[in-house]
Amino acid sequence: ERVVVNQMHRSPGVFFDHDKGKTHSSGKLLFNCRIIPGRGSWLDFEFDPKDILYFRIDRKKKLPVTTILLALGYDKKKIIETFHTISKYTFDKDTKMWITDFNPENFKRPIKISHDLVDAKNKKVVLNKGEKLNYVIAKKLKEKSLDKIILNSKDILGKYLSTDVKDNNGQVIIKAGFDINEEILEKIISNEIKVLDLVDIDPINKGPYLLETLKVDKCNSKTDALNEIYKVLRPGEAPTTQIAEDLFKNLYFDKDRYDLSEVGRVKLNSKLNLDFKNRKTILNTDDIIAILKFMLDLRDGRGEVDDIDHLGNRRVRSVGELVENQFRIG
């Protein structure tokens, strides 16, 4: 005879948590996220102590999170533009300065500016280095017709490139995602680069975590990313591009092999403020992008983690469901 008892387990959905400072000696909080389906492979996202963002499939070897975005068809430029605001910087030959648009939206959270704010029209300083700048002040400056500001070359040090920088022959001399240091700045000046697309990064309010992750990612294309994921899931086997792509699609985007469940979909939509009309029980690109944005917000001090032990995040597996699972295994 066999007795079957109802089981309580984690409810399907997406859950955000941190290690409570136990992993790193400094007590730094390392945030993580897990997507638990009703049936199928688990998908985890996690920060390491260096603020690099990784993902794992079924708790296997971790890979940089940009690898999964490349596998979804994004290129590096699109990855950066999805998560960050990009500003165009134009080099002015006469003044030897860089000119860019002044956008109050970049100052939603107050900062102390790291350089003088100079009006490009009249070359007057409107705010001195070290002064406080917030959205209200920025909006007033914009209303007073501050449209463009100028910066000297040293002021763009530390900013990240959103696109590859090419020389006059079309050769890539600096890859997208790298921050401008003295050496890179010298390359930009010596190659007479006139226009740069730079990421608006403010270390206090929005960190460069995804940009730093791009640096450690060895993959440069969708094919590279699919092959890298295949190697983790099927070590020792040499994949073709089609086999690698089929394996990746079957993981989370095939309703026969993956089922987030209706409860999981509702919880995911609710947590991430996604389209409530979406009732599909497979993952899509928008889900993964929204989850990564939430993870980045958590690291920047916005949003709250979930209580894994709360009974609202648990559900009862009935006897019928347990029997159904045994039949599926058979």
For each feature predicted by the language model, list its residue ranges.
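N-terminal non-catalytic structural scaffold regions of very large proteins
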Residues: 1-330
